[in-house]
From Swiss-Prot:
This is ATP-dependent protease ATPase subunit HslU. A double ring-shaped homohexamer of HslV is capped on each side by a ring-shaped HslU homohexamer. The assembly of the HslU/HslV complex is dependent on binding of ATP. CDD domains: RecA-like_HslU (cd19498). The lineage of its organism: Bacteria, Pseudomonadati, Pseudomonadota, Gammaproteobacteria, Aeromonadales. The gene is hslU. It comes from the Bacteria. Transmembrane segments: none annotated. GO terms for biological process: protein unfolding; proteolysis involved in protein catabolic process.
Amino acid sequence: MSEMTPREIVHELDRHIIGQADAKRAVAVALRNRWRRMQLDEEMRHEVTPKNILMIGPTGVGKTEIARRLAKLANAPFIKVEATKFTEVGYVGKEVDSIIRDLTDAAIKLVRETEMEKMKYRAEEAAEERILDALLPNPRNSWGEEEKADNSNTRQIFRKKLREGQLDDKEIELELAASPMGVEIMTPPGMEEMANQLQGLFQNLGQNQKKKRKIKVKEAMKALIEEEAARLVNPEELKQKAIAAVENNGIVFLDEIDKICKRGESSGPDVSREGVQRDLLPLVEGCTVNTKHGMVKTDHILFVASGAFQIAKPSDLIPELQGRLPIRVELTALTTDDFERILTEPNASLTDQYQALMATEGVKIEFTKDGIRRLAEAAWQVNERTENIGARRLHTVMERLMEDISYDASEKSGETFVIDTDYVNAHLGKLIEDEDLSRFIL
């Protein structure tokens, strides 16, 4: 798992997300506490439970983006799920236990990649030998049996050529593991686990089958390295490591949790609201979930929930669930200054993306400082007049601004366009002043 300090985590998040310092600090401390817990002795480690987080803030301010970036930094089993996908046990729809099953699958993939990377050197050696065997087959006697030949010098010459890439385009015939059977099983909602088990059964049927293929040396090397690395990894040990990683370092990001709040005016059973909250309680508190890889305890899995809470309030969550989300972080609405920074500061910002896209057509785009400021003001004004969708509004406004250039770019190779205040006003001014802003409403 990640050994980054909270300050380093916040610094990394700052490269992609503007503002929201409180939320960044909260997730950074939570992530670091995962590492701190693993340094304790076993008895104390068992007692230290994660402090789950509830992020509250309007749409488009960075809640989901924090989760996306955190997933890359965590280097631990991580899954992001929408709370609205689940229903109460006994009704049609996904059950909340599938969260832990999906998290375990993610851990298996993560651990397998890590283990295969460790075995890469040995796998490369084995793959190299198999390719040399295909390039320099042993002669056969009159009975069709292979005879060992002393071709060590020739083998060394070919090994040197292989490592230098001189044989990359040469075609050889190899026995490679057959691709797993692609079986798509349709099951009623809520029975995904049965579908997964049946798919695993069909895939195992053809697991040890070999197939002769003609393939170029470069492609053969990649395929053989993967095959040899997979052979060197112990599947049982891999499962144990993955389950341990889930239980100790697993992180679940539960988005749109405000959508499963029971609203006061509603009547009748809310199978996808309060029932889901009740089903989430044991997961968040700590229980044991049966997965196809083994039993998984959820006592030390970190849950980060988020929601806009525009209609519902955090207090509309059932009290037991509120108590299991002790750390509350409020994200603030974005201002014009924030929009201006979003357009220029993050890695691969919107302006950088459009410049790179147009450069493929030979068109140069230059954004002036006053042009970016006017664009930020335009997005903020539209948000104020209609529905406030936060930074997502920049995509809509930017696409409208660049519409003409994008359409004509292929005929205007070599030209330069300067996006300044006048250009923004000319393309967006009337629409911003007009009360009918349907073009901007997503």
